[in-house]
Amino acid sequence: MALTVVKTSALSGNINLTSQVTGTLPAGNGGTGATSFSPGKILQVTNGDYSTQHNNSTDDLADIGVSAAITPSATSSKIFITADTQYSMAAVGSQTFMGGVNIFADKGGAGYNKISGGGSFGEYYALGFTSQATGVERRVNGRWTACMLWSPSTTSACTFKLYSHNNATNGLSCTYDSITTHINLMEVGA
């Protein structure tokens, strides 16, 4: 903190902070003291929560049930996305079971498209295990989390959802045991 000096001639009567004080004054009333802000300021925050267990027993994409929407204030804005869900994967028999969760977005009503990851096999099936036993259930439980920065280049409403998928007709449950699933959205100014 810089040293603040008050002139001795100003010690009686009122002190004029613009002419009788030198140095840096602390910000009053909890302010930051900043006179301008650089790009990257958070402009708005929205979120969506969901607490009903979703079970996917097909090899198709399935909407988990959670959604959140945000309308960017400028085409140059970015959206910082965090998402998480409790999952449980189960299989009976000798097999390799793989599954995953991905973030999908709908820009201005144009339909949902996957925006998370590059689509590689390892990224798409981020959860998995191999079961060598037959007739015995194998189960893996955990918390899937993701965060990413997305550039929608629009001022139209953007809605986000999570989709689950797996490679077989086994069970992949999300929002497992009704533990809340979240999507949090923050508009970051350019």
Language model features with spans:
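Glycine-rich, low-complexity segments
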Residues: 1-53, 190
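Extended, low-complexity regulatory regions
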Residues: 66-68
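Terminal beta-strand-rich extracellular "head" domains
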Residues: 48-49, 54-55, 60, 71-157, ...
